[in-house]
Every structure is written in structure tokens, then in C-alpha cells.
Amino acid sequence: MIRKANELKKSLEPELKGGIGTVRLTHFIDEHEAYGVGRLFGVSTIPPGGSIGYHTHKDDFEIYYIMKGIAKVVDNDKEDILHPGDSMICFEGESHSIENIGDCDLEYIAIILYTEKRRG
């Protein structure tokens, strides 16, 4: 199956997880097409000064791959800076947040996969 850019589902998430601003999501596939392995497969875009608030993953885990911009992340209370080409994994039971500290949009691939507990 081929999907052109204009066919991909897009959504807006204001103040995601208590963050600042509105995150734009472009979904590669829908959760229902993922055969029960996960719930997010796409590109997240955070405007300058925006963020996704600190939160904990339960029965799933998340992977980030930075494509554009500069991100300040908190990974289990440890702060770091990510640049294009960097990645981060927040495993089940762990916590994280991400903030755009650059002057252009922060774009990154975001994938949330279920753990065995969730897939049952």
C-alpha cells in the first residue's frame, strides 16, 4: 500500500500530557492497522517553545528519532539535549518529556509500541 503525503491522517494535540502549545502529528498508519503492536507511528512536530509534558509509560514504550530542530528531553529525571540523528527510548514504567528549545519546528519520528502485557 502506498500513501501519498496528502493522504496521511493528521491530528492536533493541544497541551499534550500537560505540555505547552499544540503538537502536530502525521500518522504513517492508524492504530487499527498496526495488528495490535502499538498505537503511534508517525512524525511529531512541536513549534518553538512548545513541549510534551513529563509522563510515565504503562504497558507500552516510546521511541524518538530526531529529524529537525533541537530538543531538550527529560529521561527519568535526567535532562539532555538531542539533535538531528539522535534517538531516545522510554521503556515501560519509565518517564520522559520533550521540549523544543530551538527557533524552528522540532520534527521527530515517534513510535509507541505495546509491551507483552498490553498485547495479551
What residue ranges belong to the model's regions?
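A short, N-terminal "cap"/entry segment at the start of jelly-roll beta-barrel domains
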Residues: 1-38, 119-120
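Conserved short histidine dyad/triad with adjacent acidic residue
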Residues: 27-31, 42-57
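Short, surface-exposed secondary-structure edge patches
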Residues: 43, 63, 77-81
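Short, conserved beta-strand element in jelly-roll/cupin
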Residues: 45-47, 56-73
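A generic "binding-loop/recognition-motif" signal
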Residues: 48-50, 59-60, 78, 94-95, ...
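Histidine-centered metal-chelating micro-motifs
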Residues: 51-53, 72, 88, 92-98
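Short acidic-glycine-tyrosine-enriched beta hairpin
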Residues: 77-92
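Ligand-binding loop in jelly-roll beta-barrel domains
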Residues: 92-118
